[in-house]
Regions:
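Bacterial N-terminal signal peptides that target proteins for export
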Residues: 1-9
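N-terminal signal peptide c-region/cleavage motif recognized by signal peptidases
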Residues: 18-20
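Active-site beta->alpha N-cap acidic-glycine motif
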Residues: 24-118, 122-125, 133-151
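A cross-family glycoside hydrolase active-site/sugar-binding cleft signature
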Residues: 33, 57-61, 91-93, 154-156, ...
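Acidic-and-aromatic substrate-binding clefts and catalytic sites of carbohydrate-active enzymes
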Residues: 36-41, 62-75, 98-103, 152-162, ...
Length: 264
């Protein structure tokens, strides 16, 4: 156990240090984030990030993939391990991609998992159960990569309540939404929102400090956003003087991650 945990801590510390050096030379930072998806575009996303020397933050859930597997199964473990070795940052998206529906009057929450044995059913979770759901993704990440996950999470759909955020905070998790201009539109209809218009809008509206949101594959979009938009977006933003960093350097999360860089 000691042999697997210590290298993970060292790698996390090195990633934070590398991010600090990058941010120090950058006065117009952006924070590119990816939520899991059907994973069909994941290899191409990784190629673009490596070619452009961009570090991103990934939020992990165990989602259905194009070949009827799961995004955190054994097939994808080498892919996640390679991204971890490249110095990207990782947070939880809840293991079963669990949507918050409502706070319950007597305490706890109505939640709807997208995947898993209770998929598409509304289930009650108390604070401890929700924390365990967040931790499941972190545990699986460590199994796949030998590294530990950052104490960051993104609720599916960004749907939360003050009570849910407080419950997650009590067990050490910090929620990460996205900036309005950072919604890159890969979830939208490609007929109504073609890639060219999404790229134009992003280049026009994104401002320094924005958190950008994309996915590793969206089932409903017929003309995939990535990699068609991803690389011209990155190069276009760089031409405007922007640079990219992980959320370890975002002012909202930086101090918390330096104090507690990883989950147990």
């Amino acid at each position: 156990m000691q042999r697997s945990i210590v290298p993970g801590l060292v790698a996390a510390a090195l990633a934070l240090a590398a991010g600090s050096a990058q941010a120090a030379a950058c006065d117009k930072p952006l924070f590119l984030t990816f939520d899991t998806g059907h994973m069909g575009v994941a290899p191409l996303v990784a190629e673009v990030l490596a070619r452009q020397q961009v570090k991103a933050t990934f939020f992990l859930a165990n989602e259905k993939t194009l070949n009827d597997g799961r995004s955190l199964d054994a097939q994808w473990a080498p892919w996640w391990k390679a991204r971890a070795a490249e110095g990207h940052l990782f947070g939880s998206h809840t293991f079963d991609h669990v949507y918050w529906r409502a706070d319950r009057a007597g305490g706890g929450f109505d939640m709807r998992p997208t995947f898993g044995p209770q998929a598409d059913h509304v289930v009650r979770m108390d604070a401890a159960a929700y924390c365990a759901e967040l931790q499941r993704a972190a545990t699986r990440f460590t199994e796949m990569t030998g590294q530990r996950m950052a104490p960051l999470f993104r609720a599916p759909g960004g749907k939360t309540s003050p009570a849910l955020l407080a419950a997650a905070g009590q067990c050490g998790w910090h929620h990460v939404p996205w900036s309005p201009a950072g919604f890159l539109g890969d979830e939208l209809s490609s007929e109504q929102f073609p890639n060219a218009s999404l790229l134009q809008k992003a280049l026009r509206d994104i401002r320094p400090g924005d958190i950008l949101l994309a996915h590793l594959g969206i089932w409903s979009r017929q003309d995939p956003w990535a990699p068609a938009v991803l690389e011209p977006l990155i190069t276009g933003l760089k031409q405007r003087g922007h640079c990219f960093a992980t959320l370890a350097e975002h002012p909202t999360y930086r101090d918390a991650l330096r104090a507690t860089p990883t989950r147990p």
